[in-house]
Regions:
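Short amphipathic
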Residues: 3-13
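Short beta-strand element of the conserved SAM-dependent methyltransferase core
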Residues: 9, 38, 66-68
Length: 92
C-alpha cells in the first residue's frame, strides 16, 4: 500500500479555478500514474473531473489541498502545485 501525499496551495490567479484552468489541471493530472484528489472546505473531488473541480468554486484567495496516491504521486503533487502557483500560465 502506498502513502497518500498532500500539499496545500493558494489560488492566486484572478479568475480562480474556472473552466480553462480546470481543463489544464485535469489534463496534467491525467498524465500521472496516481489517484489525485482536490479538496476545498471539506469537499473532495477527483482531479480528473473538470465539473468536479469547477463545483469546488475555488476563487482567488481560496486554499485547496491536492492529494495523490500511487507510483507517481510525488511527481503529480509537484507538477500540479507548480501549475497552480504559476497561475495556470494565464497571468504573466
Amino acid at each position: 500500500m502506498t502513502e497518500r501525499l498532500t500539499r496545500t496551495v493558494d489560488i492566486s490567479n484572478q479568475r480562480g479555478l474556472h473552466a480553462r484552468a480546470s481543463a489544464k489541471f485535469v489534463k496534467l493530472a491525467a498524465t500521472f500514474d496516481a489517484e489525485v484528489k482536490v479538496t476545498k472546505d471539506g469537499s473532495t473531488v477527483d482531479a480528473r473531473s473538470i465539473m468536479g473541480l469547477m463545483m469546488l468554486a475555488a476563487g482567488l484567495g481560496c486554499c485547496i489541498e491536492i492529494s495523490a496516491e500511487g507510483p507517481q504521486a510525488a511527481e503529480a503533487i509537484e507538477a500540479l502545485t507548480q501549475l497552480v502557483e504559476d497561475r495556470f500560465d494565464e497571468e504573466r
